[in-house]
């Protein structure tokens, strides 16, 4: 499911706005049939038919995508990447009960589900998908990359 985000109706621009990037609210299922909520960012200068590498950005534990993950995603989109800031299962716009559960194996799957989603976008270079994990998401991004060969690069920020 894909929806346009207008700056008047979203928290996607809490910390930083960019006139060089478009944003869309999206969602997709993980293998556990839970909806994963995300914000998809693209450079405005992309030409029709052009493919770009993509980066999945995971939020810190105790946070949601509209906080640090969106900032990293927008900044990387300004540098030419397609980016996807995700809410891990049980957090934010993603499904899962009880809320705020910590489940590393499901979180690693959320990164793989994000790679599934990005791989179906006509503007994503499928051989160029990577991940940025902030705080706790750093370990989930590394775990996902260990089992999912589609994740070609991983960067962590303040990983624990």
Placement of each model-derived feature along the sequence:
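Primarily recognizes the serine-hydrolase "nucleophile elbow" in alpha/beta-hydrolase
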Residues: 113-160
């Amino acid at each position: 499911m894909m929806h346009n985000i207008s700056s008047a109706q979203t928290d996607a621009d809490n910390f930083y706005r960019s006139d060089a990037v478009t944003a869309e609210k999206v969602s997709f299922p993980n293998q556990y049939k839970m909806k994963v909520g995300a914000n998809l960012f693209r450079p405005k200068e992309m030409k029709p038919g052009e493919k770009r590498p993509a980066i999945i950005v995971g939020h810190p534990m105790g946070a949601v995508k509209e906080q640090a993950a969106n900032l990293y995603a927008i900044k990387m989109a300004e540098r030419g990447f397609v980016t996807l800031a995700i809410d891990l299962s049980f957090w934010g716009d993603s499904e899962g009960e009880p809320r705020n559960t910590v489940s590393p194996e499901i979180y690693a799957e959320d990164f793989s589900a994000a790679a599934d989603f990005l791989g179906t976008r006509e503007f994503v270079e499928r051989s160029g998908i990577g991940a940025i994990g902030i705080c706790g998401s750093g370990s989930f991004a590394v775990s996902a990359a260990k089992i999912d060969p589609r994740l070609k690069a991983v960067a962590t920020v303040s990983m624990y």
